[in-house]
Every structure is written in C-alpha cells, then in structure tokens.
Design a protein with these regions (language model features):
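Hydrophobic adenine-recognition pocket in adenosine-nucleotide-binding enzymes
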Residues: 117
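A short glycine-rich, Lys/Arg-flanked "PGG" loop and its adjoining helix->strand segment in the class I
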Residues: 127-139
Length: 236
C-alpha cells in the first residue's frame, strides 16, 4: 500500500486557485458543499493540522491543503483498493486488511476525508474502516463523508477535486465503479461509535453530507472541578 506524505510550511490566507483553473474547459459538474466549509473551518483552528485523505491523489487538493491549511497531508487511496477488489485482482480481503492498513498512531489525525467511499463498501469493510477512523482521530478532530440515500445497482467512481472551501468538482474516475449501498443514519452512528454528528445536510442530489466530531476528553482537573460543582450545595 502506498502512502503519500506531503509537509507544507505555514498557512496562507488566500485560497489556492489551481483547483479552479480550466473550469470552463471541463464538463465535469462543480457542486456546492455544505459540510466541507465546516470541515475546513475546524482544521483552520489548529496549528499545523494532520489530515488524512482516503481518496486518490489530486494535485489541486494537495495545493489547497498546503496553502489554505498549512497541514501535514497523508493520502491513503482506499478507492484503489476497492477498485482492485471489484476487478478481482486484490491480494487481500478488504475488511481483513483494515486493522493493518494504516500505520498512524491512535489519536494522531485531526481530520479525515472519506468522500463517498463508504457507499462502495460492504458491511464488514465499512465497519472495519470505521473502527480505524475512530481510533486514528484525535479528540476534537473531524471526519467528513458523503452517503447516498438510496441504493444504486451500479455507479461510477468519482474523484472529488477541491475548487475552493465551498465547492467541489466531481471528476470522472477510471475505475470500474460498482454497487452503492445506502446506510441508514442509525447504522452510521453505530459504526462510528465514539464520534458524534456535528452537522448533516441533505443535498438536492439526495446525497447526505455528514460531519462527525470526536469529543474532547475532559482533563482530570476539569473532571474534578465538575464533580465538585455537582456536589457543592448552591448558596442562597
């Protein structure tokens, strides 16, 4: 498995324009996102955040993450793994490979971009990946994913190119595509046990954009203060 790591210096206030170049020359749709601006805002509050992208390498996305967020970026192209599985050329079972797929330490990632990856995973693979996402995510961190609201017998893969912090270009992907599975909200919450839904948006194309957050654990002193306040009678 190939992991691409890119380290950038400081943040820049201006958004990269590389993702928007040549937009008029393409017929690929540009779609406004509701969750992505909130995901960006969450990471912007952190100094040198660590970001994990589960999609393919896209140059303009790398540029945006470096220039806009000043982040350390890891790219783990799980869509390529799914493509190999559907083609019948995968060497390992997708669900079984998840526990060893990621070398990242527990609680070491500030943000994870899942895109629509979960739509193409079977139940076992989806659950195994969700466990790893919860494990790797740092308290206060965010996860963004797109989930279809109805099953599709066959759908092409999509590459999501960041145009700016509010819009994404839906680009064609050369993979074979596959069946899309619709996950009920309760199943998503159960899968990501330990995370909470910070925001959920239903778009006109019937895609649910979901932003999940990991709660920040209270420090021992904060816990003691809270317990003390709860047991101290109020003055009248």
């Amino acid at each position: 498995m190939l992991t691409d790591l890119l380290k950038w210096g400081g943040k820049r206030s201006e958004t990269s324009s590389r993702g928007a170049e040549g937009a008029s020359e393409r017929d690929e749709p540009i779609v406004a996102s509701k969750a992505f601006p909130k995901f960006v805002a969450t990471l912007s509050q952190k100094e040198s955040p660590v970001l994990l992208d589960l999609g393919p390498v896209i140059g303009s996305n790398v540029g945006f993450c470096g220039e806009r967020l000043g982040c350390k970026l890891f790219i783990e192209d799980l869509l390529a793994d799914v493509d190999r599985t559907l083609r019948g050329t995968a060497k390992t079972d997708l669900a079984g490979s998840m526990p060893t797929r990621f070398a990242h330490r527990d609680g070491s990632i500030d943000g994870i971009l899942c895109w629509d990856l979960f739509d193409f995973l079977d139940k076992a693979a989806a659950q195994a990946l969700a466990v790893q996402i919860v494990r790797m995510l740092r308290p206060g961190g965010a996860v963004m994913g797109f989930f279809c609201t109805s099953a599709v017998e066959r759908s092409p893969f999509t590459k999501f190119e960041i145009v700016d912090d509010k819009t994404l270009r839906h680009r064609n992907h050369p993979g074979v595509g596959g069946k899309k599975v619709s996950l009920p909200n309760r199943d998503i919450l159960r899968m990501f046990e330990g995370l909470v839904v910070a925001d959920s948006f239903l778009l006109k194309n019937n895609t649910r954009e979901i932003l999940l957050r990991k709660k920040i654990l209270a420090t021992p002193s904060e816990s003691e203060a809270s317990a003390s306040a709860a047991t101290t009678p109020a003055k009248t």
